[in-house]
Regions:
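Expand to "…catalyze enediolate/carbanion chemistry for C-C bond making/breaking, isomerization
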Residues: 1-208
Length: 208
């Protein structure tokens, strides 16, 4: 079974919609060529794309005959830490996705469309855990600044202001955004990394 394509159809923007479908097509072609027997997508509108690709290649019930003998993966490969850059843009992305997902989760929605992707709790968990880790280890950003609580709170405030402007005061007030910000901030700066983001969020639900 292949992985899930998180892309969703983009309304009122043909160019972005074409990009989303192309990403899904490339992803599913890679999977079927690697020997997967099936796959899944985040949105029913993308099922025909995935079905077409797999139906065209699969001639039987499975692809057990397909092997990747030309690929060698070692223990060192599995343990190698990614060496990508750490950026302010990355922090902002974590904040705006994490806060909006928590807000939706508190309102009873588990799968949330954000920035043309269907997100779930795992995305929000990665977002807050990454910021927690950067704070814990005083990570350096690519511009030389150290990630500390002051920097995090400054960027958090900036992103929340941006989000309020986009959503509008009425939507913000009617939603659970203030509580979502509170949960995200508290979990990010905590001395102990919570086991999973939804645990303290669930406590908020049962206590309200």
């Amino acid at each position: 079974m292949g992985g899930m394509a998180a892309q969703i159809p983009v309304k009122n923007n043909d160019e972005e919609n074409d990009k989303a479908f192309e990403k899904v097509r490339n992803d599913k072609e890679r999977e079927v060529n690697n020997g997967h027997d099936g796959t899944w997508v985040a949105h029913p509108g993308l099922v025909p794309v995935a079905m077409e690709i797999f139906d065209n290649q699969l001639s039987g019930d499975n692809q057990l005959d397909v092997s990747l003998d030309n690929v060698t993966i070692t223990q060192d490969d599995l343990l190698e830490v990614h060496k990508g850059q750490r950026t302010e843009e990355g922090m902002r992305e974590c904040i705006k996705v994490g806060v909006q997902y928590i807000e939706a989760w508190l309102a009873g929605r588990g799968a949330v469309p954000l920035y043309n992707l269907m997100e779930d709790a795992a995305t929000a968990e990665i977002s807050r855990a990454q910021i927690w880790q950067w704070l814990k280890h005083a990570t350096k950003l690519d511009d030389g600044r150290t990630v500390n609580e002051e920097l995090f709170k400054d960027i958090l405030t900036s992103e929340i202001d941006n989000l309020k402007n986009v959503l509008g005061d009425d939507v913000w007030a009617k939603g659970k955004y203030e509580k979502a910000v509170e949960i995200f901030e508290k979990m990010s700066i905590s001395q102990v990394c919570e086991e999973f983001l939804t645990l303290p969020a669930y406590e908020e639900i049962v206590s309200s």
